[in-house]
A protein has these predicted regions:
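Feature captures hydrophobic
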Residues: 1-122
Length: 122
């Protein structure tokens, strides 16, 4: 199961980086906690390489936690808008260094604006 989770985390991260190219240069360690059935799986994600290990990430600048079922649902289509909705509704929570969180939020908002402008032109 954790091997599957590692692959899903890596695929989700690389897919989101493709949708938000401005985040690709960001070097960041993210701690990920997946809660489910009475236990918590902890992973360490290194960006931009999308390298995932099953480990406690003591050096993480950003920490993300969610239920395993929610993670599975989000990675099924791996769309930025679905991830954003999960953060807004509290199904996914992010904590950590405020500057990183604000930077990521600003970059995502600018990417959304670019997408809206593209659609408006067509």
């Amino acid at each position: 199961m954790s091997e599957d989770a590692r692959r899903l985390i890596s695929n989700a991260a690389s897919g989101l980086l493709e949708q938000i190219p401005a985040l690709k240069p960001l070097k960041l360690v993210v701690g990920i906690d997946l809660h489910g059935r009475g236990d918590t799986q902890q992973f360490r994600l290194v960006l931009p390489e999308c390298e995932v290990t099953k480990d406690i990430s003591t050096d993480a600048k950003v920490h993300v936690e969610m239920r395993r079922e929610e993670f599975n649902r989000l990675t099924e289509h791996n769309q930025l808008k679905d991830w954003q909705q999960a953060f807004v509704t509290g199904r996914v929570k992010a904590t950590g260094v405020d500057q990183y969180l604000k930077l990521i939020q600003q970059v995502v908002e600018k990417q959304n604006e670019r997408e809206r402008l593209k659609k408006a032109r067509h």
